[in-house]
């Protein structure tokens, strides 16, 4: 006869799943409202989504220090809190953009908002666990919702993008499960902190099994955060989806992937397994450099920003590879500042979107579209120029501070060559960012009567989000120290 197991409710510490429960409840409320009423506006669903995201953020910031719960599947620590903070801030900035011109019909469906909230919960589960099963559940929940959100744009290119993303996601899921299985065989556990103890005790033997498991899991993570050579899907998928969702994808799925990578790679880096550090060093250099070179030859601004985002992911991987408290703090500082810059840049692409393409019919956002933008829409050109200068790492704009602190952490840890490579690539990237600025300010407008091309979708919510993003980018010099202190406090909670 099976023995009855008595588990006190207090020991489950169910408060650890409260943030995810909030947005899941929000998604179910939206679906329930749609079931009983068919005439609710997207303004109503947008407002509901923002309310639940804000409640979720409040639940996240309620935690301090370190806690586990839900049969030890859940882990709330400093990096979990910081990453959820980034996810929710980005989501709160994204969802009001649904209040745009009526032709973006996907925002009229309540299912869009429900899927978006389910996706947020998936990302939160990913970053709030060190158990490979729950990480996988979160990964697939978020991915399946995101595939659908991309396809709901209802253009041929959006369907193609969703299929490409789904195919790569399915491959990554296969790699993740196979790698997890091999590491389970080697260690007897799927909990990363216990796995680390067991592997260290066994001196990472059997080595071939550990190596194979590492390679498969590293490949899965590489697909999700667009590391070279697993990045090839990224430009096509970003090009096919709508611009602001592409901007969101360049930030939120990647921070979730970075946290998983940080927890997993720390098993090997903390034990000073040299071949792992060398492999990550090589991937870092490759991911920073190759997309930069590819971005130089792009004819479409959106594809250029896609390759740019891959290169920025390489900077984040450098922080993970260095694996110090300073580098981990630099990663979060970098990504918070990158969030506002990149989301602002992609939103500007949407503002200048038009059904009529007078320039290059192969692309939606060729450089020629922005010719003479300073004469047609001077404020828009200045804002886009600020976002480009920030992405290039030009002081005193936001991303400069992230790059500077990250390079400082590399120098302090003895990675002098890596710091030089980051500096050189920042200089290279300035070419394609400045290229867009030259088109906007120094080229003649190709169509003198095309004022309606620009600010086509510039509703008040879009103007507000762009203005807020630009304000953070410009004024970051005044609050970056306090932001860094805030980040450092939570990183130290985690022991990184």
UniProtKB/Swiss-Prot annotation:
One GO term (biological process): ATP synthesis coupled electron transport
GO molecular function: NADH dehydrogenase (ubiquinone) activity; NADH:ubiquinone reductase (non-electrogenic) activity; quinone binding
EC number, UniProt record: 7.1.1.-
Superkingdom assignment: Bacteria
GO cellular component, one term: plasma membrane
Keywords on record: Cell inner membrane, Cell membrane, Membrane, NAD, Quinone, Translocase, Transmembrane, Transmembrane helix, Transport, Ubiquinone
Primary localisation category: membrane
Reaction(s) the record says it catalyses: a quinone + NADH + 5 H(+)(in) = a quinol + NAD(+) + 4 H(+)(out)
Cellular localization per UniProt: Cell inner membrane
Membrane topology: Multi-pass membrane protein
InterPro entries for this protein: NADH-Q_OxRdtase_suN/2 (IPR010096), ND/Mrp_TM (IPR001750)
Regions that span the bilayer: 16-36, 43-63, 79-99, 107-127, 132-152, 166-186, 208-228, 249-269, 279-299, 304-324, 331-351, 381-401, 414-434, 460-480
PANTHER family for this protein: NADH DEHYDROGENASE
NCBIfam families the record matches: NDH_I_N, PRK05777.2-2
Assembly and interaction partners: NDH-1 is composed of 14 different subunits. Subunits NuoA, H, J, K, L, M, N constitute the membrane sector of the complex.
Family under the similarity heading: Belongs to the complex I subunit 2 family.
Function per UniProt: NDH-1 shuttles electrons from NADH, via FMN and iron-sulfur (Fe-S) centers, to quinones in the respiratory chain. The immediate electron acceptor for the enzyme in this species is believed to be ubiquinone. Couples the redox reaction to proton translocation (for every two electrons transferred, four hydrogen ions are translocated across the cytoplasmic membrane), and thus conserves the redox energy in a proton gradient.
Protein name according to UniProt: NADH-quinone oxidoreductase subunit N
Organism: Wolinella succinogenes (strain ATCC 29543 / DSM 1740 / CCUG 13145 / JCM 31913 / LMG 7466 / NCTC 11488 / FDC 602W) (Vibrio succinogenes)
Lineage: Bacteria, Pseudomonadati, Campylobacterota, Epsilonproteobacteria, Campylobacterales
